[in-house]
């Protein structure tokens, strides 16, 4: 009683001395002990009756029925033993928070304590007690299962213990609302420092309910203050001190599971922490990187992505690399900062599940300078730093180990460019990726050779490649971290599609343009022809005028109207009428020469009327209509007279009556640009036909003008045109062509030349009748001159046909002979191939077995064309065909049958031979030889000394007959071989031709080879799927283990210990236990690696005990290590749907498959022992294995 007496009387507060208090004085004294810390007016406690010395105190009871939620919170805030250090006083708190109500609740509790508790009320209080003790669900569960009496005793013991240890007697605690009010004041001086320090102590010492009460609103205020301090440009000492204090408060808040979850759920919390990473303030940076490390190891993959996103944003804002500040922290002299930075690096590098991503993060740290710093860090003597460096090196070796196994056990130092190139080349060589890889290297050579620019190019390319190769399942985490090069692959694909369409349209446009050019050229040629016709019309009109002037005009009643003018007689080709003849009559003077064709643009063909003949004097020619007057003072345009025909400019002209007074065309004066050089250049560039330039240009111009008026005498216009084209292409004098034909000069005679001559020359009768025109040679046009020269050659057409046959004979032999040899070789190989015979036997067995009970059962043979139908026979599950099954059987049991693919290789060429065409060409060759022999017999003796036709052709006939006889014999032998094959395989000649027979066999050979490739791909896919499945299972187990480890890190060590969550995480980081635990793997034996390699040759399976193997075969279980004599096949689980494109570590897979590979070796030994027993037992036929497989289909 005496030790409680000082707490019962407070004279300073106006209480009467000796005034007694209720019997629950100890608990009330706890509340009263807080009064001296309160500022402002104080209220004395209510008076109470005196306490008699020696009076027995009533038992402490609590009536829960009357408690509100606030009262329960206050009750749950009772501190258990082991309290933390006291907080410093909070300055300048308002008195509004001081109230006498703080003791009302305990007083009421004490007064109502004797009332009994209901079961629900006590259970509610029990839950509040466990929550206050910061117990997780796993530890709460066994406590909830205890008896009600034990729960009641635990609650009472908890209250009594708290009251005896004085936690109920401490001074009044500052409420969360008071801290929140102070933080809202917005102060940024020493007062804020004191407030934050007091808050840190309160967050550390108060129970979870107090922390939760503050965290609802206080966390946002702390983040607002931190954001304000970071965004401010003031670098004062007090600002950085406040910033550090805020981070310490966040650390204390994160020391509870509630606080840690709230921090990780806040979007801006990680971003602000990343911005607070500043090597210039080592102490603050140490706390920041520790918090980030803890978040990385305790969160899921999404949290890691958010941390990296925060670091990236901070780096972009500072215009530095995102890991620059972390690496700079390693350069600082503070060992604690170096340890914390290595913890964060290990947390970032070891947390991702994907190997590629771990390598990417590690390599980025190395590029930022970590590679140069690591040797210096290893020289520092510090246990904590040594642990972090050891973790970094071990995980680096593990990742390189997994990477090497993924690349088929190729171990190389990836820091050397030559080794990396060889590794990449070995993966793409002889694949479709080879061309793209070479293209990439070629494009790298196009980078501009500049010292500064080249570095930026390679940096940009490296960032692009890193984003592309890390793209997985449409979501690449690095896309979020590298916003500067955020590639929208969907848009890129759309662009590629549009580009493909554009190329297609451009190709069509190019084709249309070519057609347009052809049509345009034809149009220009047509216009040139029209101009020639116009010139001819003008010439005829001039002759008509001369005729009229000589013989008089037509009678007056003979009026032949001319076609009307389309332009009202304003065409520029119209000439003014000449003066009329004298009235006395007589012969008029000759008219002026006809005008030349107009220049392009002066008028279109037929744009004006044909000028009428000048009227005679006695017909009254004075009444011709005058020219129309041009509007707006326009003057007639100058009439140009080019010397040659020009190409036309197809424009739509504007007529004068369509213009206005202010029109541009009224004022133009194009004549100022006229000069002789321009017009000559224009004429030479756009003329319809180029003039041939020779030494004497003037003489040639006269000749060309003279040629234009030459007319065809005897040749048809079409023949003449074709001969003109022929002569213009060869440009050889006519006599020289004649001598080449007479001498049969094969060095100068071309096959195309002879073919054109035969095609375009007139027939022999016309040639014979041209001798009468020899005297008029100079007046003939070029084609007629050429024909006259060639008519001197006797029997020209038979001669040309014989020369053409001689020129083509060697080519015909080279075409016929290989075809005959291909068919003959194919027939021989088909008949003598043992592997092909075995294949037919195997197919016959399978077919008879499958056709059992049908009309096709018990077949003795089948048409070889039926081999092509094997691929049409599907399995029961529609996943394979009989052809693929046959290939698989041959691979497993009869590998020598596969050799028939090489034996029948001549079928590839033979199937392309048309025997009918071959025979036709051979017969035609024989007929041409006979015809040539007859020509030589009846050929007249040569009249010209240069005529060597008979001599050369006689020698050619002898040689050609020998070659023809050889070909005939080869063809006869080919037919005999084919007839032998037809009889050998009982093929109906009437129904199956040689072409069909060879084509069917070649198609079967091609599909058989394709089935081999498809089976290989199928096995690779199955093995890959199995490796992926094993890797996924292993990764899932590791993920669950990591989750359990993270869960254990968040738990308390013992039930009654209140060690913080963040303290446990930091302790795990410091010891290295928090990082990924990837077990060490040893390389597998070479033989096991080969057996598991997807590219290795599949070995032949041994004979199995099929009496016990009656389980239906599935497509996904055809690997050789799944089939053994003592095991049945397990169907592949169809519900598993894995993405085979994911980059799962092959090293992890192979390490997991090592045990299975050992089982494979043991199964092989059992199969070997079983083989011995089968070899002794001859009653088991060898085809039982095949029949068992057939039953499965």
Swiss-Prot record:
PANTHER family: PROTEIN DIAPHANOUS (PTHR45691), PROTEIN DIAPHANOUS HOMOLOG 3 (PTHR45691:SF9). Actin nucleation and elongation factor required for the assembly of F-actin structures, such as actin cables and stress fibers. Required for cytokinesis, stress fiber formation and transcriptional activation of the serum response factor. Binds to GTP-bound form of Rho and to profilin: acts in a Rho-dependent manner to recruit profilin to the membrane, where it promotes actin polymerization. DFR proteins couple Rho and Src tyrosine kinase during signaling and the regulation of actin dynamics. The gene is DIAPH3. The keyword Cytoplasm applies. Residues 636-1034 form the FH2 domain. This is Protein diaphanous homolog 3. Residues 497-554, 1013-1056 form a coiled coil. It is linked to Auditory neuropathy, autosomal dominant 1: A form of sensorineural hearing loss with absent or severely abnormal auditory brainstem response, in the presence of normal cochlear outer hair cell function and normal otoacoustic emissions. Auditory neuropathies result from a lesion in the area including the inner hair cells, connections between the inner hair cells and the cochlear branch of the auditory nerve, the auditory nerve itself and auditory pathways of the brainstem. Affected individuals typically respond to sound but have difficulties in speech discrimination. Residues 114-476 form the GBD/FH3 domain. Belongs to the formin homology family. Diaphanous subfamily. It is found in: Cytoplasm; Nucleus. GO terms for biological process: actin crosslink formation; actin cytoskeleton organization; actin filament bundle assembly; actin filament polymerization; actin nucleation; autophagosome-lysosome fusion; cell projection organization; chromosome segregation. Its main location: cytoplasm. Keywords: Coiled coil, Cytoplasm, Deafness, Neuropathy, Non-syndromic deafness, Nucleus, Phosphoprotein, Repeat, Ubl conjugation. The lineage of its organism: Eukaryota, Metazoa, Chordata, Craniata, Vertebrata. A motif (Nuclear export signal) lies at residues 1184-1193. One of its GO terms (molecular function) is cadherin binding. It comes from Homo sapiens (Human).
